[in-house]
């Protein structure tokens, strides 16, 4: 990777380089804004595992911003659901996924976990 030009890097390599750059200053909080959105499923899993490993080793907090609720519910302890820039629901990940209170959240969860209804 060190001998490649930026345009020669894969999406996963670019993400790993961005993560390395971000954690080089030893942040207490790493904001991951759509960090896996342009990656294939295998590379998504590798990036998530890398972040969770780094979190465990450094005790840094991770803030995931994502439209992919299937990934979010797997890795986050708490979820905030936003609609039009406003937080409409928040709570433990399992509660939000299994017992959504807001209509928008129910639609989001249904779309993510029950593709046959689309």
Q: Residue ranges of each PLM-predicted region?
A:
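Conserved ABC ATPase signature
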Residues: 5-9, 13
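Hydrophobic anchor residue at the start of the ABC signature
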Residues: 19, 47
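A short, proline-enriched helix->beta-strand linker immediately N-terminal to the Walker B motif
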Residues: 24-28
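A short, surface-exposed alpha-helical micro-motif characterized by mixed small hydrophobic
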Residues: 72-74
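C-terminal boundary and immediately downstream tail of ABC-type ATPase nucleotide-binding domains
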Residues: 98-118
């Amino acid at each position: 990777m060190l001998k490649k030009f930026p345009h020669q890097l894969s999406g996963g390599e670019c993400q790993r380089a961005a993560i390395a750059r971000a954690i080089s200053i030893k942040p207490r909080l790493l904001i991951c804004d759509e960090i896996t959105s342009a990656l294939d499923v295998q590379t998504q899993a590798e990036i998530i595992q890398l972040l969770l490993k780094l979190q465990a080793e450094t005790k840094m907090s991770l803030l995931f911003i994502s439209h992919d609720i299937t990934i979010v519910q797997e890795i986050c302890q708490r979820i905030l659901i936003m609609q039009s820039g406003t937080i409409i629901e928040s709570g433990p990940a399992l509660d939000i996924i299994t017992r959504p209170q807001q209509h928008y959240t129910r639609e989001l969860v249904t779309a993510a976990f029950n593709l046959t209804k689309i």
